């Protein structure tokens, strides 16, 4: 049962027109000089000379405009071709991967990975792990979820830790490096946590392994890259730790949370019944201990509201997402963590009492509209 309770709490258009205007202006000047020289003439020949430069000027103006339109259309078509080439390149890379995600559906870390995979339209299979027996991941010495198994040709790679999974796969999509090489950039490291327990940490897990040109194309500047990393870590180190005390805040909320966990999870009939009642009672008391460990307020909703509003303030009013016009990895991480509360009282309170709902719905829409 100790494993079961981890299911929701696991650890140039203007340029083109100028190109058209310049010849027209030059020919107009020539036309005015010709008209002055012919002004003393008379008869049909003079009339013809008088009208000829005007016709040439009008023709030149039309030609200049057409040239401008041509260059504009050519520029737009080339831009579309480049976007199509990048999309095709990413599609080609993603089609070379066969991904299997081992998860608990209600785990915030697993939800982060699903948000990333769905937004980037990466096809994957899901294996729902039984939180009690965990037989589905008996092949792995790493016993936490999420785990992603990635088949690339003859190479099969195991990716552990939600942030490593996301960073490695994003690096793969942007750079095209072999995944077997990329995962060597995120070596595991043994450490002892505040409770004296040995844990596995991963170096560089918020860093994408890109060269200078790739990083410039993706971020545009160092500030955007640093900001993304900062808030991805914030989601892991702070936001995720507020979820459990909020969804298990009262006995009724704890029971509702475990009812949701049992419905969405991979439990046997007896296991499900035990998890719903015994697990709910256990997590109600454990959440109190977690509240003290993370120095949360007596009313943990206040910490949840404060965190949500802090995130909204960081995104700001001048951009729809922290990533600008589309979600970046920080947007997807925060969204993925919060999404596990959907359908619970804590989520409804969050939407009512903070300013996060417009941003949340924009991310939800962006993921839903990702090309499949």
State each model region's role.
Residues 1-3, 371-372:
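A positional/structural detector of protein chain ends, strongest at the extreme C-terminus
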Residues 6-7, 194-358:
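GST-like fold's C-terminal all-alpha helical module
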């Amino acid at each position: 049962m100790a494993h079961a309770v981890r299911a929701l709490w696991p650890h140039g258009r203007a340029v083109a027109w100028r190109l058209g205007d310049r010849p027209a202006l030059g020919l107009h000047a020539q036309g005015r000089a010709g008209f002055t020289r012919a002004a003393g003439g008379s008869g049909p020949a003079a009339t013809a000379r008088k009208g000829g430069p005007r016709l040439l000027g009008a023709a030149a103006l039309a030609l200049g405009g057409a040239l401008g339109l041509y260059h504009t259309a050519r520029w737009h078509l080339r831009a579309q071709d480049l976007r199509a080439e990048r999309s095709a390149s990413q599609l080609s890379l993603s089609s070379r991967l066969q991904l299997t995600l081992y998860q608990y559906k209600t785990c915030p870390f697993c939800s982060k990975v699903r948000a990333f995979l769905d937004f980037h339209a990466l096809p994957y299979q899901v294996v729902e792990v039984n939180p009690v027996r965990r037989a589905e991941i008996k092949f792995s010495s790493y016993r936490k979820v999420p785990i992603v198994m990635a088949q690339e040709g003859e190479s099969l790679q195991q990716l552990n830790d939600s942030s490593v999974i996301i960073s490695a796969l994003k690096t793969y999509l942007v750079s095209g490096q072999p995944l077997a090489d990329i995962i060597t950039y995120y070596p595991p490291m043994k450490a002892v946590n505040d409770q004296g327990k040995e844990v596995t940490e991963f170096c560089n897990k918020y860093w994408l392994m890109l060269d200078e040109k790739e990083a410039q194309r993706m971020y545009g500047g160092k500030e955007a890259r640093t900001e993304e990393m900062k808030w991805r870590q914030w989601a892991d180190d702070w936001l995720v730790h507020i979820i459990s005390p909020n969804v298990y805040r009262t006995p009724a909320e704890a029971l509702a949370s475990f009812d949701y966990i049992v419905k969405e999870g991979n439990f046997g009939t007896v296991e499900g019944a035990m998890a719903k009642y015994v697990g709910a009672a256990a997590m109600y008391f454990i959440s109190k201990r977690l509240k003290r460990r993370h120095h949360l307020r007596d009313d943990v909703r206040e910490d949840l509201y404060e965190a949500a509003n802090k995130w909204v303030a960081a995104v700001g009013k001048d951009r729809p997402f922290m990533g600008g016009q589309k979600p970046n990895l920080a947007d997807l991480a925060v969204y993925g963590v919060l999404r596990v509360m959907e359908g619970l009282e804590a989520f409804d309170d969050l939407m009512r009492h903070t300013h996060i709902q417009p941003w949340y719905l924009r991310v939800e829409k962006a993921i839903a509209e990702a090309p499949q």
